Amino acid sequence: MAMMRLSTSASDGKANLHQGAVGVGICIATGKAVRAVQFDQPVTHHPDTGKELAALQVPHWEKLLTLASSAWEMTGLGYMGTDMVLDQEEGPMVLELNARPGLAIQIANGAGLLPRLHHIENLGTPAEYPKAAERVAYAAKQFGVHGSEIVSS
């Protein structure tokens, strides 16, 4: 699952959801917005700018996902949250890895995480683990969102 956090005047310029930032669920296959929430309630436009959130498309999406997926080799954690930024000069960068990430990502995506975790667990332990790019391709195919679920005004 993926989520983008957008700061607002209500969140005092911080990207903290509990302070009023907007959480935008992102399709794992495309990097496009699927749903957005503020204070756990659906929103279609940014409260300050008025921009339609359904129009959001994360640049360098595949690079971001591959970098996040490669964190598994570094940590061995089966489930983790990866906080990332897009630097103008350096591109995708990892800010931090969280062994116990928040669950607000489920609200922003309008979907539960448990079925995805069960799906992955049911795959079993392979003789050889797939590379990061292969894991990204698998997740995109299995967990991508269909067009009918995308936010609109």
What is each residue range found by the language model?
Residues 7, 41, 100-102:
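A short acidic/small-residue loop/turn micro-motif
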Residues 10-87:
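A long amphipathic alpha-helix within ATP-dependent nucleotide-binding catalytic cores
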Residues 1-5, 13-16, 94-97:
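Beta-strand scaffold of nucleotide-dependent catalytic cores
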Residues 45-63, 73, 77, 86-153:
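C-terminal active-site "lid" helix and adjoining low-complexity regulatory extension at the edge
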